[in-house]
From Swiss-Prot:
PANTHER family: REGULATORY PROTEIN SSL2874-RELATED (PTHR38449:SF1), REGULATORY PROTEIN TM_1690-RELATED (PTHR38449). Belongs to the RemA family. This is Putative regulatory protein Tmel_0100. Disulfide bonds: none annotated. It comes from Thermosipho melanesiensis (strain DSM 12029 / CIP 104789 / BI429). InterPro entries: RemA-like. It comes from the Bacteria.
Length: 94
């Protein structure tokens, strides 16, 4: 259960739809990026900067981000813990 996650430059994604956050340097991921571009499933959120992370969604969309994978993963965990805290407060009241 995740909320919206900031992936840089004011771009946010639905955290629940992301399957993987990976480093873009390997040849298979470069091919994956090119295939997504050909299929019209590539979303470039880098604003012209170097791609540092590739996010893979459950709909097979490929999202490029200029933020490091580790930073995005930390934002996922922060979002998860914030939602868990809110749910716990609701449970205590109810």
């Amino acid at each position: 259960m995740f909320g919206l996650i900031n992936i840089g430059f004011g771009n946010v994604i639905a955290g629940d739809r992301i399957v993987a956050i990976v480093n873009p340097e390997s040849a298979p991921l470069k091919r994956l990026k090119e295939d997504a571009k050909e299929e019209g499933k590539l979303i470039d959120a880098t604003y012209g900067r170097k791609t540092r992370a590739i996010l893979i969604s459950d709909s097979n969309h490929i999202i490029l981000s200029a933020i490091q994978p580790e930073t995005i993963a930390q934002r996922f965990m922060q979002s998860f813990f914030e939602i868990e805290e809110q749910l716990e407060r609701i449970r205590r009241k109810g």
